[in-house]
Amino acid sequence: MNFKHRSFFKLGILLALFIINNSCKTTSINDGFYPIFNGENLEGWSGDSTYWSVKDGVLIGEVTPEIILKRNSFIIYEKEQPSNFELKLQYRISKNGNSGVNYRSEKIKNKPFALKGYQSDIDGKNRYTGQNYEEKKRTTLAYIGEKVIIETMPDSILLTNIRKNVKRNCWQTRNITASLGNKKELTTHIKDNDWNTMHIIINESRMQHYVNGILMSDVTDLDAKNRMIKGYIGVQVHTGPPMKVEYKNIRLKIIS
């Protein structure tokens, strides 16, 4: 191969690498996800500034001995109430922390910054992280490692008294259809006091919670009396001991 041909060959390789590199970047940019937290302030969100702040691109929820919570408090994304979507974020939580990511949730009247609805649970000891817990409503729908179908609530139970269908903080009209794995093994994939990635996929009646790429719970909600088909997204600080939870890179993708 002469010098001229070698030059064209090298140029061809460089051009191919450039195209591949830019193709990867385009895929990343056009993956359908967009940020809903700007990393600078609380624009688009509402919450109690006693507990929520922004620093270095991170949304921080903190409870100190001086400002102990009397009830759970959320910071709520106000700009939209999505129905079918994917939500990706990174979180870090202290050992005694208790938090969660709510979605398809509704505001509770006369209680500022309170939500009721589906939640992908998060706690520092990883007893509940990734399970599906319905805040202020049907309680636990699926524990870690469960694939569950929620059946319609019996007609004998009134909507005003759904707690009648709850035992030991767990909804009773549910069928475990498969195991996603052993809870102890699944939670080994969660890093303590470090950044983890949560990916929530909500499509029609199905809700899947992933942590660091591992499916922790999978719920299909067929309970037309109680299920929500759209609602607010929010993240929580929980009653209990002093705690700190941090969120960053919160991104949403609408599923059409």
Language-model segment annotations:
Residues 1-29:
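Bacterial Sec-dependent N-terminal signal peptides
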Residues 24-256:
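Carbohydrate-interacting regions of secretory-pathway proteins
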